[in-house]
């Protein structure tokens, strides 16, 4: 580990992560702008919501680190479900729960309440995958985490636009 500072400050676990190219912005269609036409939520819309979340350790987005990809987002608008699998940059990433919590909070703040969300680690990509997924799936733990003012501040930093 080397010194450095991301959102949480402190030491970096992955000092030299691979950086991926951002995908292009999705063009808005006339149908999407028409308020009279029902607009279902799809995987690209969810990806657009989470792609710019800041990594807690690096001055990069989750998309730039390939932590989130559109292919790992599943949506069923009729069933009101969203599933997002995310891949930490290293198998022992201690920030995995914070990253998952940031994704979950972004979705909670952005989507209609009818949606049920499943935010989880991509299978086989993290040493503590089961424990992290269990925490992220536990509504009471998530609510308690968001009552912690310091943790909420860190999540909000991950969700804020970088200048």
Curated annotation (Swiss-Prot):
An individual GO BP term: protein maturation
Cleavable signal peptide: none
Any one Gene Ontology cellular component term annotated for this protein: cytoplasm
Keywords (A to Z) from UniProt: Chromosome partition, Cytoplasm, Cytoskeleton, Nucleus
Top-level lineage group: Eukaryota
Gene3D superfamilies assigned: 6.10.250.1280, Fe-S cluster assembly (FSCA) (3.30.300.130)
Pfam families given in the database record: FeS_assembly_P
Compartments where found: Nucleus; Cytoplasm, Cytoskeleton, Spindle; Midbody
InterPro entries in UniProt: FSCA_dom_sf, MIP18, MIP18-like
Job of this protein: Component of the cytosolic iron-sulfur protein assembly (CIA) complex, a multiprotein complex that mediates the incorporation of iron-sulfur cluster into extramitochondrial Fe/S proteins. As a CIA complex component and in collaboration with CIAO1 and MMS19, binds to and facilitates the assembly of most cytosolic-nuclear Fe/S proteins. As part of the mitotic spindle-associated MMXD complex it plays a role in chromosome segregation, probably by facilitating iron-sulfur cluster assembly into ERCC2/XPD.
Protein family (similarity comment): Belongs to the MIP18 family.
Oligomer status and interactors: Component of the CIA complex. Component of the MMXD complex, which includes CIAO1, ERCC2, CIAO2B, MMS19 and SLC25A5. Interacts with CIAO1, ERCC2 and MMS19; the interactions are direct. Interacts with KIF4A; the interaction facilitates the transfer of Fe-S clusters to KIF4A to ensure proper localization of KIF4A to the mitotic machinery. Interacts with CCDC117; the interaction is direct.
Protein name: Cytosolic iron-sulfur assembly component 2B
